[in-house]
Each structure stands twice: as structure tokens, then as C-alpha cells.
């Protein structure tokens, strides 16, 4: 049987069809709903009726009326926001149907967006059409019960027409100049004032007065430490300005050159402070923070990398960054802004993220399970790791990497995430983020992203593309159900907390990176703080050395001796249990299992024909890779629920897509030889070996229960299907036609219409029909 397309599900559940705004000749695009279920009723309309969002003392978001707030949403970025109002309305309706309660409007200052065309002489004026469309977005989101999140400095291109000196030499976003140059900070404030205090003609509200504006980001992927190599290539007059600030800081700290020299001491027989360096003459160099930078004078490089100079340099830059954040924060509050504020820097550098936790209301960061890599030798080709993220349990895995955000008991927002196309293991990404965002009790999770029109690379929105999941059944197809599980706390947060303690004397050590200790986040909640002592073994001090691995063993064993189902054995077996017992990660097998009273998930690499028992969910399948989710929609345990949904996704590619092994010297193991185009195919076909699904308790009165006849069988490999069971009726959608299956032993065959089955109370089948919604 030939592969069928994900658009079949769209036809069954109601398409949202739009024409591209960049030309009437472009084809109509249908955006599939995430699920056949309509979750819009879970949203309270309009957004903001509980008052402005605030931060609580317990490190979570609350509304003004005391209700705790959690968010699950998506990003719409840059030129993807530039679509007609009727299309905006339909996209937002699709988000509401998915039950999303937050949308981040990202990079609105990008080229050809709010600040005008790329060839505009300055970046001081708003483009009227783009602003109008942005106003439509904000108003439509508010009306549908969806909160919105705004960035201020993303990719703004400062120009000579702004009276910015050497603007042409700056990267987009003016990294890192925008952190310390007074005029650039003034321009950022002017931009923020114009954006946040303009009156939206559709809502009648200024954003600062709109409680649907839930979060504001001062700067996106910025800071001194995200790209430290930029400090080596600063242009004038900014280079001299930063150097002078550094020397004045040293003078204020040490008083005299002699005291500075004594504090910095010697390295390899040479004084760290060179003879020609004197803070009084503003001649002391900043440290060299990047390992990759090749200095023509090796001895000079060593002196600039001396630990005392490094520590002082990192502290100086951290304090300067804090001044910037505090200045911007205070200015935004002076405008009347009531929404919580953050800035996005590098969460794997302790002083960097600590500076945000000190000055802002919450911390935020990205996590990606795969990224695009380029090779100048092969322009046009893109390279990917194409690995299964569930096989990664090191510090760069989703839980350890994002756990680095938890500082000062501030709320945590994963404001961008995704395992991007064409990674073949994307179907694990939603379960993985859901599991560990729940375990760590994060406050917002926002998928990146959603394409609405033709992309700059020419890809239409009906195709899989870079950071675009709107037609991806393996990601977007799970996003609504995963969101409901997150928003209803279907997975418990961790019962225990591990604290990473950074002594003040070592906070500014360089190089800085995530520690092996962050891996404890696979099992318990992880937080970080600056302190001088550790109360017990649940608190450990990262050193950035191999000793951190031994500290991790001690930490895991500490909890294990107190009855928690974890120990250092996870480091060798690759099996990680959450302290709640609800999440099990099989790193060596590339599989994740989640079992709670109302939710069961089996995701990852599977052994065909093997029976997997995940709580009340029991699955056997011919697929070697899949995600299957069962969720109770009425809050009752899965086996007793009267309203539940079961969904299975496997793989999805563009038509004619070709992902090949890359040459050995390529930057990543796989290359995208041909991107392909829409429609998306899922390769569903008939199979002699069926997928079998049971929803039954494993034990009754403490005794094992033999499995009865399967609830559902599907004689299919690959493909996507979803079944809702409610009030004596089952409704099954499958993106592949002519697939034989059974429900409680009764045969059916899929078609391009939904199969609807009715039951009596004791599961007796009384009829089968095919119907369109």
C-alpha cells in the first residue's frame, strides 16, 4: 500500500486553509489540527481575566488572584507573523483547538519585519503594515484565551541612520555592544517604549496594560559569555570603551598597580600583569575567554588566560551585564509594565545565568535535540546528527541542560525547544520534554516553531522545514495531548531536590560549563545557588573536573539510601528512574516510559513483537520506532476512564526527501541531500504483524491480571492513528486507508473517513459507521 499523507487527518478534523501572503499564485496550505480533539474549551477567554502574571515566593508563576499559572505553547517568528488578518485568526483558532495557552512572538525586530525592510536607512521607525498585523496577533490571542510573550532585542540591525558608530561592523543584535554602550541602550529603551505603550486598535489596550501579555524578554541569546570570541574583535570606539571600563573596575577594586600585581601573582615564572599594563593608564587587557582564539604570541595568550585574570574578567563582565539588565528592567517597570521580565543568555555558564536570576523575574533558555551544521566546502548542503535524544544522558541532554536554569528559586521557562527535522527520531521529543519539564516542575514550555507562509529558503508551509512543525504528525501531532498532560500536572514533579552550591570564590571560575552533577536531573529536581556551605550530601559543589562524576555518585547514593529508587548504577546501566517512579529512561535502548494514574507513554526504539507494559498501557507492535500515548481526559485512572484518547505516531518525511550518510570528514554524520516538498508522507502500510493495544490494570488486589482480548489492533506498520473513546463511542482516525483492524474483536477497515463505533456499558459493540466530522 502506498504511503499516505498527514493531510488525511486534516480532512477528517477540519482544515484551516490559507493562501500565502506573498503572492496569489502560491498554493493553499492546510494546517492540520494537532488532534481530533478540540481543547479550546480548556482556555478561559479572554486571556488575562485572573489579572497580571506575577512570580511567587516558591519559584512559580501566579496570577494576581492567586491562581498558579503554567504554560504550554509555541513560537511564531519574524516573517512568519506577516500574514493577513483572516489567516492570523485561523492560525490562532488552530492553536486554541490544541489547547495552547501561550504564544511567543519571536524576532519581530528581524529584517523585513517591524523595523522595516532590510534596505531601510535606519531602524528607528515601525513598519505600519507589520505593526498592524502584530496588533492582530496580540488581540486574537487574547480573545482566544492565549497569553503572549514578547521579545525586545533579537536580531535588530542597527544602522548608520540611527547615528550608531560603525553600525555596519556589528552583527545583528549588536552582540555584545548592546550590553554596555549607553546610546545603544537608549535605542533599546526607545524601541521598548514605542512597542509597549502604543495602543492596539483592536483590543483598545497598550501592551503594558494588557494582562494577556504574560512575559517580556529584554534580549534573546545575548550576553558576554554566549559568544566570548566576539570580545576579541570589537570595533572602535566600543573596544576602547570596554577596556576603559575594565581598567576603572580594576582600579576601584585594587587601588594601585602594585596591589593588582600582588593579587594576580605569577604563572610559569612570569607575572600575570605585564610590565606595560597599568589600570591607571587604562592599559590592562581583558582575559582571553575563548579556547578557539589563536593568539600570535603564545606567552601573551597564557598570561591572558591566567586564572586570576580570568576570574576578575568574568566578574567584571558579569557585573556589567547585571547593570544592563537592571537598567532595562527598571526602565520597563517605569513604563508601567507589569509582566515578568527575563533575558536569555547561556545557561551552561554559571555566572551568566546567575546574573539573570539576580536581576530578572524568571530564567529562560532553549534546548534542541539536533541542530543544523554547515560546511563551507559544500554550500547548500546541511548536516545533522540524526541521533535519538533518548540515548543521550550526559550534561547536554534535555533534563541536565535545562536544569541549569534553576537559580535563586526563580520560575523556569523553556521558551524554545525541538528535535528538528529531518531527524528521524523526532517522535520522542514531545514525550521527553513533557516528562522532564514535569519532573523539574518548569513553568512554561514553548515549541519552536510554526511556519505560516513561504519560508526564506523557498519551502512552503505544507512541507517539513527548519524549525517548523505545523505539518509534522510526529511532533505537532502530539503537541495538544502532551500539553493537556503538562497543564493538568498528569506527571508529578520530583519529590526530592539536589542543590548545586557555588562558593562565591569560585562562581567566576573559567572556563565554565554544565557539570556531571546536572545529570541528577534525570531523577530528582536540581537547583543552583551561591553559598558558602553545604548542609548535607543532597548539596554538592561543581568543580568542572572529573571529580564531579564521583560527586554525582555520592549524590545518587545519598537519595538511594533514603528509599528513593535511584543509585549510581544508572551511570553504567543507562536506566534512569525518576524519584516519583513515574518516568523510566532506558538510555542504552533509546526508550522512554511514563506511567501515571492518568497517562501512559511508550516512546523510542522498540523490539518488534515484544509486549511492553507501561502501567495500564500494554503494547505490542511491528514498528521498530514509535510513540504511543494513552491519556485519561476525565481525570479517572486510565483503566477506569470513560473518556480517553490513544494515539500512535511513527515517522514522517517530505515527499522525495533524501537523508544520506555524510562523508567521514563532514561536520555531522548525516546530510540532507534533498529536502523534498509537501505533502508530508508517513509511510503507513499493511502489516501481517499487528499493533496490539490493551488498557488494563497490571494487578488487581496485588495479583497479576492476564490480558484479555486487545482493546485495539491495527494491521499497519508506520503511519499515524488516533482514537478517542467517550460516552460509549469510539472514533478512530488513521492517515492510511484500507488498514484492517479490530476493536474489542470486531473488524473494521480504515478509509478517508473516521471510523465511529458505539458500545454498550460493558464494551459490547453495537454498530460501526464511517463519518466525517
Predicted feature residues:
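A general structural signal for short secondary-structure junctions and capping/turn motifs
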Residues: 95, 140, 205-208, 352-356, ...
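Catalytic-core region of carbohydrate-active enzymes that cleave or remodel glycosidic bonds
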Residues: 197-198, 321-342, 348-370, 383-562
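Active-site mouth of glycoside hydrolases
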Residues: 46-330, 334-360
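Long, low-hydrophobicity ectodomains and other hydrophilic envelope-associated domains
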Residues: 488, 493-773
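N-terminal pre-domain segments of enzymes
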Residues: 20-50
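Signal peptide processing junction and immediate N-terminal pro/mature segment
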Residues: 14-19, 208
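Bacterial N-terminal signal peptides
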Residues: 2-14
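Short, charged, surface-exposed secondary-structure boundary motifs
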Residues: 372-378
